[in-house]
Design a protein with these regions (language model features):
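N-terminal glycine/serine-rich phosphate-binding loop of ATP-dependent small-molecule kinases
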Residues: 1-97
Length: 97
């Protein structure tokens, strides 16, 4: 099976992935939850590293479920949880305000 499409949704509480054919037949799907941190009352934040680990995890899971190679994926679509801005410093570390 070749020409597969990978859809990734980075949501508020988890990441979901779907592997499908160009005609829309779902081959595999997976999700990975991650925490919301509350550093003080009225604040909520997430660690972008959790998002990345989640993307890697669900991608590996759907590829394994479908028993396909990554080079069979010809397109990737990503949706996110709204307009989120992640500030990083020169070393690539998250800046906490």
């Amino acid at each position: 099976m070749t020409d597969l499409l990978l859809g990734i949704d980075i949501g508020t509480t988890n990441i979901k992935a779907v592997l499908a054919t160009p005609t829309g037949r779902i081959i595999a799907q997976a999700q990975n939850d991650y925490p919301i941190h509350y550093p003080q009352p009225g604040w909520a934040e997430q660690d972008p590293a959790d998002w990345w680990r989640g993307v890697v995890t669900v991608t590996r899971v759907v590829l394994a479920q479908a028993a396909v190679r990554s080079d069979q994926v010809v397109g990737i679509g990503v949706s996110g949880q709204g307009c989120a801005v992640t500030l990083i410093d020169a070393a690539g570390e998250v800046v906490h305000v």
